[in-house]
Amino acid sequence: MFQGELRIDSQVPRGKGLKSSSAVGGAVLRAVASALRQSRSPEELARLAADVAQEIGLSATGAYDDCLAALRGGLVLTDNSKRTVLRSPPFTPGLGVVLWVPSKTHVPSVSFRERFQAEAGAGRAAVESARAGHWAEAMTLNTELVERIMGYDYRALRSELMAHGAAMCGVSGMGPALAALASEEHVDGVASRLPADRGEIRRIELRLRDGGSTENE
């Protein structure tokens, strides 16, 4: 029987909508596969991580999209119920990410899940925009849905970020973190509009992995 000790050291804060559970789940399985000298693709590891997350009740869908994006990087649109990739186009280099991570924490609740299920139609509109390649529109539609259900009020802040150079911006996961993508010359301007007194501001540089996906610097 395989035995070992696992130590997790992550820079991704919990309860902020930054997909810490999916990132950790995929990383753990990749570490175990490596220790057992087994070669597994990101898709295989993501499917297994999603199955486990769904089985133990960590995620209603398994969050296959989050698991795969954390393992592989890049733009990923998936069918979580079928554990398949719908679209994964090349990522355009030259964009930076600015994260605003509020001090408050998201606490999962069954009531939120039920409210998202009731708003499935609005969610499908965001998916169709993404399938058509309209990523900014999809991000906005998804953000408006999450804000409505979770009670966030970021509309004015999002407008401010877009006015100062953000190519797109929106809530990460179920929040409360907010993410904005901007060209390198606009990253500082976007970051300057975020309320530093109410949360942490992080600038994340993206670089291409082999195959055109992205990885945090």
Positions of the model-derived regions?
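ATP-binding N-lobe of GHMP and related small-molecule kinases
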Residues: M1-K16, S34, S192-R193, E205-E217
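Phosphate-handling active-site elements
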Residues: F2-E5, V32-A49, G189-L194
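A short glycine/serine-rich beta->alpha loop
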Residues: S10-K19, Q54-T61
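DPxDG-like acidic metal-binding loop motif
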Residues: L18-P42, L71-G73
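Alpha/beta catalytic cores of group-transfer enzymes, especially the acyltransferase/condensing modules
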Residues: E43-S88, R158
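Short beta-strand segments
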Residues: A70-L71, W100-S103, S172-G173
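Acyltransferase
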Residues: F91-D153
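Glycine-rich, charge-dense phosphate/pyrophosphate-binding loop(s)
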Residues: A132-E217
